A protein has these predicted regions:
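Active-site mouth of glycoside hydrolases
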Residues: 28-325, 331-356, 360-404, 408
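Cleavable N-terminal signal peptides of Sec/SRP-targeted secreted and luminal proteins
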Residues: 5-26
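Short, low-complexity, Lys/Arg-enriched N-terminal segments of secretory-pathway carbohydrate enzymes
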Residues: 1-3
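C-terminal helix/juxtamembrane-tail motif
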Residues: 405-422
Length: 422
C-alpha cells in the first residue's frame, strides 16, 4: 500500500511538471504597490498573517547581495537576479545581513557601521519587495568568511579581553554584547529607500541567528542551547512581528541517540536539532544538506539515499516533536565535484525537488519549502563557489526550478481549498 501511494503521489507530481512546464512564466518585472503580508506560524505550518492562508514556497540563497549592492554601480545585478528569480516563481531569498571587518564591511568595528554598505542592504530589501520576494536575513557567520565568530573574538582580543577560543562567542559577555548590538542595529534599521524600519517590513520573512552554528568545545549542544535561548528572546524583545530561526544544518545530538548514530553523516558539531529547535522563541526549524561534501566518494545513489533519509527524519521530528515548520535552507550540487556534469545537477535537483514536494504533501505542509544554494548573475565570477546557478545560462535548470515553484504553488492552493471546505 505504501508503494502504491508513493507512485500515485509521484505520478501527480510528474503530471503537474508537464502541465506547468515551459508555458508557466512568472512576472519578470516588479509590481509597483504590491504589498506583502507578514508570515507567521500556525502549528507546524506557515500562514500569511492577513488571510490565514497556507504559505509554501520555492526559494534560493544569494549571500552576496548586500556586499555587491554596497557599490551603486553594481546594483543592477541584484535587480537582475531578483527578476530572474521572480520569473522562475521563487518567492523567498536567504541572504546575509552581516559583513564584519574586511572588504566592504558593514560592521567596521564593534558598534561602528559603514552607512554606504547599510544602504546596500536597504536596496536589497527594497528590490525584494518590488519583486514580491520575501527575505530571510542572517545576523552572523559561524565561519571566518565575511568576519563571523572569529572576527568578534579578534575584536575582543584587540580590546584587551581574554578570549580563549572562537566558541567563547556563545558564552563571553563581551562577545554576546557585541552581537546583541548588531542585532539591535539591523532590526531597528530605518530603510533609507522604503522609509520603513526593518522590524516593520513584511518583506522580511524571518531573522536567522547564525549561519550554520557549531560549538566544538561542547558536543552536547547545551552551550549552544543557552545562547539560542538568550538571543532568540532578545530578537523578540525588539521585534514581535517577524519569525526567528537558528540557521542550523540539522545535526542530531544526544536527545535522539539513534538519529545521531544512524542519520547524522558522521559529524558532531555541538548542536542538537531537537533541543535547540524546541526553544519557544524559535519559530521554525531548518536543515542544510550537502551529501556531496559529507559523503564525498560515495556513489550518486548513496548520496541521494542519504538525502531522502535526512529530509524524511527531520520532517517526522518537526511534525511530531517540534510541531514547527521545516525548511530545507541550503542544498545544491557543486561543479567542483569529481566528474561533474550539468546533467548530474539536473538529475539531483529534480530528485530533491520531487522529494520535497512529496514530503510537503505527505506532511500537510510541515515541510514548507526549500532554498537552493545559490543564484547569481552574469559577471560575478569573484563570488563563485562551485554551487552557483546562473539561470540565463542554464535554461534546463531554470525549467526545473520553475516547475517546482508551480508544483509548490499548486499544493498551497490545494491546502487552501481544503482548509476552506473543512
Amino acid at each position: 500500500m505504501a508503494v502504491a501511494t508513493s507512485l500515485v503521489v509521484w505520478g501527480m507530481f510528474v503530471l503537474m511538471m508537464l502541465l506547468f512546464g515551459a508555458g508557466c512564466q512568472a512576472r519578470r518585472v516588479p509590481l509597483p504597490g504590491r504589498e506583502l503580508a507578514f508570515v507567521r506560524t500556525s502549528g507546524s505550518h506557515f500562514v500569511l498573517n492577513a488571510s490565514n492562508s497556507p504559505f509554501l514556497f520555492n526559494g534560493f540563497n544569494a549571500y552576496w547581495m548586500m556586499h555587491l549592492a554596497s557599490d551603486p554601480t553594481q546594483r543592477y545585478k541584484v535587480s537582475h537576479v531578483f527578476g530572474e528569480a521572480s520569473a522562475a516563481g521563487l518567492t523567498v531569498c536567504r541572504t546575509w545581513a552581516f559583513s564584519d571587518g574586511g572588504d566592504r564591511a558593514l560592521q567596521i568595528s564593534p558598534g561602528t557601521y559603514d552607512e554606504t554598505v547599510f544602504q546596500g542592504l536597504d536596496f536589497v530589501v527594497s528590490e525584494a519587495s518590488k519583486y514580491g520576494i520575501r527575505l530571510i536575513l542572517s545576523f552572523v557567520n559561524n565561519y571566518k568568511d565575511f568576519g563571523g565568530r572569529q572576527q568578534y573574538a579578534q575584536w575582543a582580543t584587540n580590546a584587551g579581553v581574554q578570549i580563549n577560543t572562537e566558541d567563547d562567542f556563545y558564552t563571553h559577555p563581551v562577545l554576546k554584547d557585541y552581537y546583541k548590538n548588531h542585532i539591535r542595529k539591523v532590526v531597528t534599521r530605518f530603510n533609507t529607500i522604503t522609509r520603513m524600519a526593518y522590524k516593520d517590513d513584511p518583506t522580511i520573512m524571518a531573522w536567522e541567528l547564525i549561519n550554520e552554528p557549531r560549538c566544538q568545545l561542547d558536543y552536547s549542544g547545551r552551550t549552544l542551547n543557552g545562547w539560542v535561548e538568550e538571543m532568540a528572546a532578545f530578537v523578540k524583545s525588539l521585534d514581535k512581528k517577524h519569525l526567528v530561526e537558528i540557521g542550523m544544518e540539522g545535526f542530531y545530538g544526544d536527545t535522539m541517540p539513534e538519529r545521531k548514530q544512524f542519520v547524522n553523516p558522521g559529524y558532531q558539531v555541538g548542536t542538537d536539532f531537537i533541543t535547540n529547535n524546541l526553544i519557544k522563541d524559535i519559530d521554525f526549524a531548518t536543515i542544510h544538506a550537502y551529501p556531496d561534501i559529507w559523503l564525498s566518494g560515495k556513489s550518486d545513489d548513496e548520496q541521494m539515499g542519504f538525502m531522502e533519509r535526512w529530509m524524511s527524519s527531520h520532517l517526522e521530528d518537526a511534525k511530531r516533536i517540534l510541531k514547527k515548520p521545516l525548511v530545507i535552507a541550503e542544498f545544491g550540487k557543486s561543479s567542483k565535484d569529481p566528474g561533474f556534469s550539468l546533467n548530474e545537477r539536473e538529475v539531483y535537483m529534480g530528485n530533491v525537488y520531487r522529494d520535497i514536494y512529496r514530503f510537503a504533501r505527505r506532511g500537510g505542509g510541515t515541510m514548507s519549502g526549500s532554498l537552493v544554494w545559490q543564484l547569481m548573475g552574469e559577471g560575478m565570477d569573484g563570488y563563485h563557489d562551485g554551487y552557483e546557478i546562473i539561470l540565463s545560462q542554464t535554461p534546463s535548470i531554470a525549467g526545473i526550478i520553475s516547475r517546482q515553484s508551480h508544483a509548490m504553488t499548486t499544493l498551497m492552493s490545494h491546502f487552501f481549498t481544503n482548509n476552506n471546505h473543512a
